[in-house]
Amino acid sequence: MDVEKYLQERARMVEEEIDRWFPREVKPEVLARASRHLLEAGGKRLRPCLVLTSCEAVGGRVGDAIEAAAALELLHNFTLIHDDIMDRDEFRRNVKTVHVLWGEPVAIIAGDALFAKVFEALAANAKRLKLPAERAVELFDTISKASFEICQGQALDMLFEGRKDITEAEYLSMIGSKTGALLEASSKIGALLGDGGPKQVKALAEYGRLVGVAFQIRDD
């Protein structure tokens, strides 16, 4: 199998789905432009691809998790917008950051708008598949807990600034929350939507978290 081609095809599917959930026609125009700014600047689309590949890995079809795949990318970009504000970063993906172009108030609401759409897209996915209530609850429980854990990771990252005595355990805990949590949620949600069994869901969730930790170690 041509892995690169496989991922490119799924990335294109995700782009189309993102446009459906957060189109350029969103009003007011400044909200659409600010919210979509980093989405249109590129990115690896790693998280949505994890959703789709995990879904397929347990026997589901790629279309079974397409709304969720878009939702995870929207959530990721929400965290990037707010992260850039806190870190005072001026560039990301070779373009100016949202708060630099539109100011912090607009950047905050642009991120919030993306976050709101996450749950709408997930709800649509669950409704379309007619997910059993217990599995739908697990879907939203997963995304909610991951969102909170990302906040914990970011808080730790901020507290670590200026410290020179950070232990390996502290560092791994921080990146596990800040980066690993969202990739864990991505692979777990894909497995849930693909109708994976408990062992499959658990294994893919653990895999996603480890991928996230490894990714962040390499990035750092």
Please describe what each predicted stretch is.
Residues D19-D220:
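Mg2+-dependent prenyl diphosphate-binding active-site environment of isoprenoid biosynthetic enzymes
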Residues M1-F22:
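N-terminal amphipathic/basic leader segments beginning at the initiator methionine
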